[in-house]
């Protein structure tokens, strides 16, 4: 049972990308985007804990999601926009552009990142921050795109992640 209003379960549908069955992720994502979010009193299932419900919708509507918080990797889902751009530092932009996207065309046929074919449903945060174009061609029927995924290596960024410095404890104020 999938309960979208229970935020800890939001990543469940993306497990299919890791099991080399990304068409199932695309199908479920489509069902949630169009079935559980809409304009109306019940158009947002569950509660909006710190913006997680909205963040899930916005990222997936653009066609990707950060499956594992803290890991600099995005998994590709089912975009609903024809084109959307994210403004980045240093006048860069990351644009997601779809080809043949429609309500019926919910499956991914092929993906290119800056003109280079992606054969797995993953890209890194580093790639997003470099800017460029993620082009997603859609299909009305499930495809074999992304079925040769080897996500273990994709978890590692090109550069090591810098550890966060520990926060110094705050000393309590003395009563005057």
Map each language-model feature to its residues.
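Beta-rich accessory regions
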Residues: 38, 68-162, 171-176
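Active-site core of glycosidic bond-cleaving carbohydrate-active enzymes
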Residues: 1-95, 100, 126, 133
